[in-house]
Amino acid sequence: MPLSAGAAKTLRALRAEARERLSQASIRNAAQEVDWLLCHASGFSAAALLAHQDSPLDEEAQERFELELRRRESGEPIQYILGSAPFRDLELKVGPGVLVPRPETELLVDLALSLLPDDGFVFMDWGTGSGCIAASILLERPRAFGLLAERNPQALSCAWRNLRCLGLLGRALLVHSRTPGDLPVDAECDLVVSNPPYIPTGAIDGLMRDVRDFEPRMALDGGADGMDCYRALFEAAPLWLRPGGILLLEMGDAHQAELLKGHSDRFDFLRGVLDFSAITRCMAWRYRG
């Protein structure tokens, strides 16, 4: 139900009511998310929010807060409502149609940086989404050049905005690519990196509501066995990689990792990295040429 009507409420009262509503909506991090929404609606910093708990929130800000709270109650990702998501030390723009960056994908960036030289190189990020992987690599390697490919126009536009805000457009080319095999440009890369859709089609309905009902299905659905994009990437990567170049992929579970480890005789497996749950989350191969 909406926040109770009447005179302007104090921040303390608003926080208490909103936390109860999000808890009833099965939002796991209700207390923290209410504070994020209050800061977003009011313009207060987190410190100011605490310092002014007994002050009323003006009517306009309270209306904004109510609208945003309803969106979160419906299951819409908090990142879409706030308009941004953290990734490594960045705060990236996100919104409907764009996969929300995950902490696990930071491991993919760490592995890429550990395998690449400090001097100039060219890489491709297929399925770039918000551009989180490419932006992180470009910031860490000032002489690198990135080719960002994405099949979702909304996500490609979001990646462009993020790179523009970070001053990285001069070292990047963004292209629309429906599949790994139809890239509309020629490239010879030192690295191909991807966090592709890898969830089996039949498992989509079992995902959390904020993922299942709001995030783009094309960024999640990996086909009947979750492996469609992996097969396409292994097939297409030799078109882009120089001999000795690296293919770097994120995967969803240990079963996929085991299937992928020796997937192609054109690549030599290098190593994998475990995530916070001790599951192999990303793996690297070297292209034989």
Residue ranges of predicted features:
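Mobile active-site "lid"/loop adjacent to the S-adenosyl-L-methionine
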Residues: 198-229
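Short helix-capping segments at alpha-helix termini
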Residues: 26-27, 141-143, 164-169, 240, ...
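Conserved Class I SAM-dependent methyltransferase catalytic core
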Residues: 224-286
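Non-catalytic accessory regions of SAM-dependent methyltransferases
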Residues: 1-42, 47-49, 57
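General small-molecule cofactor/ligand-binding pocket signal
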Residues: 93, 173-175, 270-273
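Residue-level signal for inorganic ion chemistry
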Residues: 37, 75, 105, 133, ...
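Conserved AdoMet
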Residues: 2, 36-114
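Conserved SAM/SAH cofactor-binding pocket of Class I
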Residues: 103-206, 254
